[in-house]
Amino acid sequence: VRRQRQMCIRDRWVFAGSGRPQGKVNEATIVKNMDPEEREYLLYLSLYDGVTSLAIGVDSLSTLDQPTVDLPVREKPVVFYGTSILQGGCASRPGMAHTNILERWLNRECINLGFSGNALLDLEIAELIATVDASMFVLDFLPNATVEQMKERAEKFYSIVRSKHPDTPILFVEDPIFT
């Protein structure tokens, strides 16, 4: 599986290109020969490989600045908790992880707390999630948590989040295996 970086251009958030890593150190031209005008970009980094350093090069007459508006809107994000599927383990490229797609569609920050093989309803994670002033919480742990873990922890996990967010929607995602 090749890990990719992906860039999208704001307006309609169209796909602009991918860089395909070939080793530990990589250099890639993702966008070139564009008309000189102001644009905003989203840059998605690899879903699994870590990044220790990142440099973005631009034409000598160009500049990089902070976005002019808060896009996506960071106030009251949607918080997702779940498995490697949620993390983006099955996505063809980083921008195609469903949380990234939803972030673009909703124009709302989506916090992706997908943990490969580790959505085990750890109560410490519930405490962490509960610190976020979210517009919605999406809990998708069924593929990882055992029946015993669900019996022991699901209600407590929910209660921790609900106690700090009595009016915020909490969506439980069902595992397709059990439908």
Tell what function each PLM region has.
Residues 1, 20-23, 58-59, 116-118, ...:
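A short linear-motif detector with a strong N-terminal bias
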Residues 1-9:
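Single conserved hydrophobic/aromatic residue that forms the stacking wall/gate
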Residues 34, 41-115, 123-130:
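Serine-esterase "nucleophile elbow" of acetyl-processing enzymes
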Residues 118-179:
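Alpha-helical cap/lid subdomain in secreted, periplasmic
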Residues 5, 38, 132-134:
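Short, well-ordered alpha-helix to beta-strand connector turns
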Residues 10, 16, 51-55:
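A broad structural signal for short, well-ordered beta-strand segments within beta-sheet-rich domains
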Residues 15-36:
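Beta-sandwich interaction modules
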